[in-house]
UniProtKB/Swiss-Prot annotation:
This is Mu-theraphotoxin-Hhn2b 2. Belongs to the neurotoxin 10 (Hwtx-1) family. 14 (Hntx-1) subfamily. GO terms for cellular component: extracellular region. It comes from Cyriopagopus hainanus. Changing K51L: No gain of activity against hNav1.7/SCN9A. It comes from the Eukaryota. InterPro entries: Huwentoxin-1, Huwentoxin_CS1. Expressed by the venom gland. The lineage of its organism: Eukaryota, Metazoa, Ecdysozoa, Arthropoda, Chelicerata.
């Protein structure tokens, strides 16, 4: 009788350990997925980053932020006037 109680208790402890390990892996998966999504968004933000006032630019490439235009003479972003 003592042996069967010991085996039952050991089985419950083993079940608890297995459940705890699988639950902790499930909790980490969404965190990893979210962090990968945000790193992809950060990368896209770097690709589409616009240039602000006074930054050098290439005329005709539309690199300046909205409200600014690349000046062909000076080759830097200036405030867009009259359009």
């Amino acid at each position: 009788m003592k042996a069967s109680m010991f085996l039952a208790l050991a089985g419950l402890v083993l079940l608890f350990v297995v459940c705890y390990a699988s639950e902790s892996e499930e909790k980490e998966f969404p965190r990893e997925l979210i962090s990968k999504i945000f790193t992809v968004d950060d990368f896209k933000g770097e690709e589409r980053e616009c240039k602000g006032f006074g930054k050098s630019c290439v005329p005709g490439k539309n690199e300046c932020c909205s409200g600014y235009a690349c000046n062909s003479r000076d080759k830097w972003c200036k405030v867009l006037l009259g359009k």
